[in-house]
Amino acid sequence: MKDGYKIIGFISSGTYGKVYKAVSSNSNDKRLFAIKKFKAESKQVSSNAQQTGVSQSAIREMMLCREIQHENIVSLVQVLLKDGTISMVFEYAEHDLLQIIHFHSRSRTRQIPPSILKSILWQIINGVAYLHENWIMHRDLKPANIMITATGKVKIGDLGLGRLIRDPILPFYSSDRVVVTIWYRAPELLLGAHDYTPAIDVWAIGCIYGEMLALSPLFKGDEIKMEDKKVVPFQSTQMLRIMELLGTPTEERWPGLKNYPEYYQLSSFEVRYWNNLLPQWYQTVKNRDPQGLDLLMKMLQYDPKSRITAKQALEHVFFTSDKLWTTSPFLNQPIHYPERRISEDDSEVSSKRVLSTSLRSESKRFKGN
């Protein structure tokens, strides 16, 4: 059986390749799809760049997505191979969380309604808890990777940095020197942790929660670019943004702090921040729910061992004490969110290219990267 897809719009692009909006060439199938087309990896050989195949992140995403199925994880429909190019076909979502945040930052109300915020947050945690229960770390949670359907159903996407936790073939640090987008990167990663836990995902969720409240990134540091692929620079401005709000980490708050490779860098900061100002910040975003603050503080613990787990967060009183929110929060709401912007400014779109040829071979369960 051959399934074809007609590209009708360009969604976005990145280092991995491009994402398109598509429909099925089968007129009886009315669904919309998102097609992620990977560009081939290139390797410099003398003066020429040679195509060497699919990237490691693409292989990871394909393997992981074929093995998992959950209501809050974007569903893989099919893997396509055409002209040596691999594409992944996903279910389509009309929105992403970054777009929702930007919508509210420009609106008169300037706040995401509590019932919508609570539902989106719970669904993100629910999807991440499923990943963790299946020994998977996402490692790149951020608003742009949180897809949301027209009814408000969360679909976590982009598992290109996803990693199996159990029985890895290689240590985390040896295969991926840098994980998690800078504003959502946990302090143990900033301090050079070679081994880390799913707690890094929980920190990222805490940052996303704060961003939904304030409608701007909670810790917006300037990233220091890598000049040498073998040397990861200490992200001093990102660490500073965290300390300005949470205070300077200490051994009392974070046992084992001195064992991190970049611990010595903390002494280079001219100012020592003594207080955790998160409660005061919480008041400035006009939020008076003490249970929400408690959850946020438990997510943003310096010590990863003290950080709440995703499974524990699902049962936090912030969610269980309120039965008025649903997992379809956009229904019966006066707010109309515009759909993700789709462009036709791309050669694939202008040619209305049809993708086909299913990659039918089943993957085996695997261990490792």
UniProtKB/Swiss-Prot annotation:
What GO terms in the biological process aspect are recorded for it? positive regulation of transcription by RNA polymerase II; positive regulation of transcription initiation by RNA polymerase II
Give the Protein kinase domain ranges. Answer: 5-319
Residues that hold ATP according to the record: 11-19, 36
The catalytic residues are 140 (proton acceptor)
Note the Pfam families from the entry. Pkinase (PF00069)
GO MF entries: ATP binding; cyclin-dependent protein serine/threonine kinase activity; metal ion binding; protein serine kinase activity; RNA polymerase II CTD heptapeptide repeat S2 kinase activity; RNA polymerase II CTD heptapeptide repeat S5 kinase activity; transcription coactivator activity
What's the top EC group for this one?
A: transferase
* Keywords assigned: Activator, ATP-binding, Kinase, Magnesium, Metal-binding, Nucleotide-binding, Nucleus, Repressor, Serine/threonine-protein kinase, Transcription, Transcription regulation, Transferase
According to the UniProt record, one GO cellular component term is:
nucleus
Record field: catalytic activity: L-seryl-[protein] + ATP = O-phospho-L-seryl-[protein] + ADP + H(+); L-threonyl-[protein] + ATP = O-phospho-L-threonyl-[protein] + ADP + H(+); [DNA-directed RNA polymerase] + ATP = phospho-[DNA-directed RNA polymerase] + ADP + H(+)
- EC identifiers of the protein: 2.7.11.22, 2.7.11.23
Q: Where is this chain's protein located in or outside the cell?
A: Nucleus
Origin superkingdom:
Eukaryota
User: Gene3D superfamilies per the record?
Assistant: Phosphorylase Kinase, domain 1, Transferase(Phosphotransferase) domain 1
Q: What is its main location?
A: nucleus
Summarizing the function annotation, the protein's role is:
Catalytic component of the Cdk8 module/Srb8-11 module which is a regulatory module of the Mediator complex that regulates basal RNA polymerase II transcription. The Cdk8 module may sterically hinder the interaction between Mediator and RNA polymerase II leading to transcriptional repression of a subset of genes regulated by Mediator.
Indicate the quaternary assembly. Component of the Cdk8 module of the Mediator complex. The Cdk8 module is composed of srb8, srb9, srb10 and srb11. Interacts with med17 and med18.
Q: Which family does it belong to?
A: Belongs to the protein kinase superfamily. CMGC Ser/Thr protein kinase family. CDC2/CDKX subfamily.
Entry protein name: Serine/threonine-protein kinase srb10
Q: Which organism is it from?
A: Schizosaccharomyces pombe (strain 972 / ATCC 24843)
Q: Give me the gene this protein comes from.
A: srb10
